[in-house]
Amino acid sequence: MLPFDPSTRYDRQVRLWGEEGQASIGSTSACVLGSDSLATEILKSLVLAGVQSFYVVDDAKVEQADIGQNFFLHADDIGRSRAEATLEKLTELNPSVSGSASSQPPTALAMEDVEKLTTFSVVVAANQNEEIDTTFAKVLYNIRVPFICIKTFGLIGTIRICIKEHTIANSHEENPRPDLRLDAPFSKLIEMINETNLDEMTLEQLRHTPYILLHFKALEVFRKQRNDPEAFPSTTAERKELQAILMSFRRSSEESGTKDSENFDEAKAAVIRAFQRTTIGSSVKSILSSPQCSTSTRPFWLICEALRRFVTENNNLLPLRGTLPDMTSDSSRYTRLATLFHEKALSDAQEVLRLTREVEKERGVGDVISDDVCYRFCKNADRIRVQYGDVLDYNEETKAIVEKIRESNIDEETRNQKVDEATWMLLMRAVGRFQKEKGRYPGTNGVPVSIDAQDLKKRVEVLIREALKDEQDFTSISNKVTDTAIAEICRFGAAELHVISSYVGGIAAQEIIKLATNQYVPIDNTFIFDGHTQESATFKF
């Protein structure tokens, strides 16, 4: 048997979130409440991703209906503990992942073994009732363990992330602006700019000059024309003027007579993105001004305090990212530029590390931030984020949902063909209320859909009235929740459609990985998928 090599097994994942991200996944322990098809689809994706361990909690036994809904169960599993049966199959997917199961009711874990909950990186409730959801949400919110409620009901799926605070070390912003510091060049870069004389270059040298140097040379002319050493193009007209200066540097080829040159085309195309003031984004500003920077001993906030001090001491600039975009150039000048940027980024990171050691000493903690962590943090300093959440409160969320329905513009001609996502959210709340009061879900136990639809409609109306301060809005809002939609959710009969479980479970696992790696931005905080239209929406409650 070949030795296990994480970098080989998880090669594609490592390309997404790096070795440090995979290491975070490898230390993640997940507790999943439930073992139905939704739970196993979530766990399947986590096990294949390489989490350290998982723990399944469910007191259900395998029944005939489970065999048709869950690919991880077989006919000979009927009568067995469903948690144990799914555990058996899931651990076969990845031998490096350990798993365990408990046949106790999920509520017992929240009421009797809170200390055990603190050992998990995340707790997931798969198709649990509202009482279990709210019980775990309150306990886990206070001990800062992320809690995710996931439900599927027929063609509808929802995900609700409950977390007190989630820190993001790299949001992986799409198409980030290059950090070239055109308005604030560092000393070594200034030396190279001053050494560059376009007039003395041969045509071949000019056509292989990196466009960042062309930008700086065009900026010099731009400033001379204005007799202002601090001038910087900030309007469309000024950037067009700078583009014209750039293109005036071109020379004609004696052979072809044309001025075509790839590096000048790149320089012109990059002007809009490159010529932006080097500023700190609002998200990072709010983090650096947070009281947590001054008091917290958690690693993220320790290094954020060091970053805040660095910014204060360095003209309100973040550490240099240290990477260059691809550009046409000869190898010697591009290598020199890349080296200058890398060395400056390393120097900035070392200064942040020094400040971090100061903060650690002041707060009475050990060296919790390693050199590598500090360097990665500084490289992505403009992409740090923090999300804050509230404890799960279904009653408060219902008020927000009803307000969304009030604000929605529903087309009278198509309202029976397409149901608004907020309406589905309200119907899912009504389903939860129905289950709590009747001990079963609408459309089950052989009760005709028409009867349960009438019962469910009454609960929808009660929820709307509870959420409203003014009764006069009741009719207009309740009319937006059509009888067709109510009958449809009853028609589902609490069915678990594997295709919906697989899709929603995959998204949920992706969100868990975001929480585990502290990379990418998780859903904030509610997601709903409508299988009728294959459309989804997010809400912040």
UniProtKB/Swiss-Prot annotation:
Pfam families hit by this protein: ThiF
Native organism: Caenorhabditis elegans
CDD domains: APPBP1_RUB (cd01493)
Pathway it works in: Protein modification; protein neddylation
Keywords, sorted A to Z: Ubl conjugation pathway
UniProt keyword rRNA-binding, yes or no: no
Domain of life: Eukaryota
Gene Ontology terms, MF aspect: NEDD8 activating enzyme activity
Effects seen without this gene: RNAi-mediated knockdown causes the formation of an everted vulva in the L4 stage, with the subsequent rupture of the animal during the L4-to-adult molt. Loss of rfl-1 nuclear localization in a 1- to 2-cell embryonic stages.
Entries under InterPro entries matching the protein: APP-BP1, ThiF/MoeB/HesA, ThiF_NAD_FAD-bd, Ubiquitin-activating_enz
Protein name: NEDD8-activating enzyme E1 regulatory subunit
Lineage: Eukaryota, Metazoa, Ecdysozoa, Nematoda, Chromadorea
Its job: Regulatory subunit of the dimeric uba-3-ula-1 E1 enzyme. E1 activates NEDD8 by first adenylating its C-terminal glycine residue with ATP, thereafter linking this residue to the side chain of the catalytic cysteine, yielding a NEDD8-rfl-1 (uba-3) thioester and free AMP. E1 finally transfers NEDD8 to the catalytic cysteine of ubc-12. Required for rfl-1 (uba-3) nuclear localization during early embryonic development.
GO cellular component entries: cytoplasm
Recorded family membership: Belongs to the ubiquitin-activating E1 family. ULA1 subfamily.
A Gene Ontology biological process term: negative regulation of DNA damage response, signal transduction by p53 class mediator
Quaternary structure and partners: Heterodimer of uba-3 and ula-1. The complex binds NEDD8 and ubc-12.
